[in-house]
């Protein structure tokens, strides 16, 4: 039966194998094939979700950390329009990304899942929670983004102001179309704690795999999303871990303690702390995983 299911779904097309790391593809539908990487073979699957314009490559240190694991499978994928996944014309909202994620989970027959979204990847995983609930979820990890994208002031844990009076959202929505290379370079540099030319180039090359129109639409539609109620509803029910950049500690900590007080929160580095500080990040991850074993 498993072989038949495999053939019917055309689930896995092996494209690369290095050690225990495999890079594969899943055909979601006629317009979308998702590229993903995975290591390990445990009963629990940790799914790392890249942020805006990013790809599986950013989680290289987490995949290396779980390589050969017998307890955890670590998986990361390129959302539609990003990295090596298909570039369809339609569907570039985080609500649709969540539906793509649900199809990916079904195709790979995954259960006992820990979602670990980063940046707009948090929005994607909360959109999944909103649409599909927690039946297949074991825990959630939010990496440097809260559940609401906009707020009235910078005292809130958000990316943008409701009226965009500082032009920050416009800079990404319109700017990525009008001045693509400038936005990519500046955004790549901002994400890094130690933005050497080599690092900025590496991150920028990943971003260039996403078209300007797709990036603009994702940012524009993400502006309106608020999944605070969905996340707060899991307080005391689903284990939650927040790993947030150091400069946001005061604002993020206030929201976390007020709304999900049983959650674990760790603060370090800048936006790409998991890549620049892999030992500290993976240590925090391991501590969280140990704390929820048996739950």
Q: What residue spans do the PLM features occupy?
A:
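Conserved alpha/beta-hydrolase catalytic His-Asp/Glu region
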Residues: 151-163, 173-233
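Bacterial N-terminal signal peptides
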Residues: 8-19
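Flexible "cap/lid" loop of the alpha/beta hydrolase fold
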Residues: 126-130, 136-175
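Conserved serine/cysteine hydrolase catalytic core
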Residues: 209-260, 265-268
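Conserved HGGG/HGGXW glycine-rich cap/lid loop of the alpha/beta-hydrolase fold
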Residues: 32, 38-87
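Catalytic active-site module of serine/aspartate enzymes centered on a nucleophile-bearing elbow/loop
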Residues: 262-295
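N-terminal cap/lid segment of alpha/beta-hydrolase-fold proteins
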Residues: 21-33
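Active-site loop/oxyanion-hole signature of alpha/beta-hydrolase fold enzymes
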Residues: 73-120, 269
